[in-house]
């Protein structure tokens, strides 16, 4: 009996050892290169794929599969697992992209307050005016050098949208709520006002709320119809009502109405205002970076103009960006409205009026009878 048990034990041990070996398929880069794979990323991808998804196969079986993929990689591009290897093997002929030259002379543009504008901004506007799609432009007195189009620069284009001319923080804006509160109350209740400012928004890059705030912008169809936006919806939900960093702020102050015929129909007098400045948070930044890269790949420009790469509005990428940009703009507005609504509720007041205006955007307008995109 003892002898039989020993034999049984040995057999079980051998069987377990065999299973253990089979469960830990190990392939080396040398083996993979030996069957014809060239040195490069494909070797490590093949090694990882086989050892992860084919761990119950023998080395010979795994190598045979790799040989078959190597022989006809195009047959495996739709395979859920082996496509990772096949994609590294298939040589895709890249569409030839030729650099687009700038026009020798630029379109005319207005300069307001030229003596106040730095040289870098003037040079950038000269470059932008030479774009083949440029129609007209303008420089504001406070214009200064930016990326591509100067900050404070305006550019109208023909059926083309320039993601970087719109900007990274799409739809960034200022929003003002006016309350029927005597300005003296700001000093008397300073601690209270300060507490509610900090409690009802979040400052700092990447900040997110843990609780959900409902808003119709989060249910927009663009989040499901544009593949790139799908994974951004959750972050947009978490960042709704946050303020970000940099020059973004939320602050109370004094508002003085002096015009009897003001458009808000408010009596002349002094009020407390809540002013905010922020944009579309991570949603807008991701949209800007993604479509800027696409534009730079499709529209290759000279080095000094590369950030002015555009997307034609009659292309899929151009139409997608237009929809995504408008979504980001509406999201930025929703962020401000959320901040103002939370703070108004916290201080027990309802605003008499609200004013907001945005930048970092593009609009469809008419210029001398021509349809243009104004950045």
Report the location of each language-model feature.
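Short, glycine/acidic-enriched loop or turn micro-motifs at the edges of active sites
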Residues: 144, 172, 280
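Acidic, glycine-rich loop-and-strand cores that form catalytic or ligand-binding grooves
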Residues: 209-220
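Charged substrate- and nucleic-acid-binding regions of tRNA-handling and nucleotidyl-transfer enzymes
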Residues: 22-89
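Short, low-complexity, charge-dense intrinsically disordered segments
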Residues: 2-16
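Domain-length cofactor-binding catalytic modules of enzymes
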Residues: 107, 117-120, 132-135, 148-151, ...
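Metal-associated gating/positioning segment near the N- to mid-region
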Residues: 175-187, 192
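Polybasic, low-complexity association/targeting segments
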Residues: 74-114, 341, 346-350
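An N-terminal structural lobe/cap that precedes and organizes the functional/catalytic core
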Residues: 105-108, 124-168, 176
């Amino acid at each position: 009996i003892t002898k039989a048990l020993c034999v049984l034990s040995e057999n079980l041990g051998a069987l377990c050892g065999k299973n253990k070996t089979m469960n830990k398929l190990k392939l080396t880069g040398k083996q993979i290169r030996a069957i014809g794979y060239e040195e490069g990323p494909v070797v490590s991808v093949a090694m990882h794929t086989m050892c992860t998804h084919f761990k119950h196969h023998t080395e010979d079986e795994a190598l045979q599969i790799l040989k078959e993929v190597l022989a006809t990689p195009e047959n495996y591009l739709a395979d859920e697992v082996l496509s990772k290897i096949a994609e590294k093997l298939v040589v895709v002929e890249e569409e030839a992209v030729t650099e687009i030259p700038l026009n020798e002379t630029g379109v005319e543009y207005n300069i307001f307050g030229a003596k106040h504008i730095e040289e870098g901004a003037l040079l950038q506007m000269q470059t932008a005016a030479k774009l083949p799609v440029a129609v007209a432009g303008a420089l504001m007195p406070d214009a200064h050098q930016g990326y591509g189009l100067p900050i404070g620069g305006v550019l109208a284009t023909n059926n083309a949208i320039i993601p970087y001319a719109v900007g990274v923080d799409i739809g960034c804006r200022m929003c003002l709520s006016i309350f029927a509160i005597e300005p003296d109350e700001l000093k008397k209740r300073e601690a209270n006002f300060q507490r509610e400012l900090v409690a009802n928004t979040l400052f700092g890059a990447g900040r997110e709320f843990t609780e959900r705030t409902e808003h119709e912008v989060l249910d927009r169809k663009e989040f499901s119809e544009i593949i790139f936006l799908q994974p951004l919806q959750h972050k947009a939900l978490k960042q709704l009502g946050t303020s970000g960093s940099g020059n973004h702020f939320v602050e109370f102050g004094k508002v003085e109405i002096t015009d009897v015929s003001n458009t808000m129909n408010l009596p002349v007098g002094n009020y407390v205002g809540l002013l905010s400045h922020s944009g579309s948070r991570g949603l807008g930044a991701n949209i800007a970076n993604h479509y800027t890269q696409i534009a730079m790949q499709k529209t290759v420009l000279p080095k000094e103009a590369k950030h002015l790469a555009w997307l034609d509005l009659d292309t899929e990428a151009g139409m997608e960006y237009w929809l995504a940009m408008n979504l980001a703009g509406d999201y930025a507005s929703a962020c401000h409205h959320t901040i103002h609504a939370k703070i108004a509720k916290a201080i027990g007041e309802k605003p008499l009026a609200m004013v907001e205006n945005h930048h970092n955007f593009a609009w469809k307008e008419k210029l001398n009878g021509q349809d243009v995109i104004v950045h």
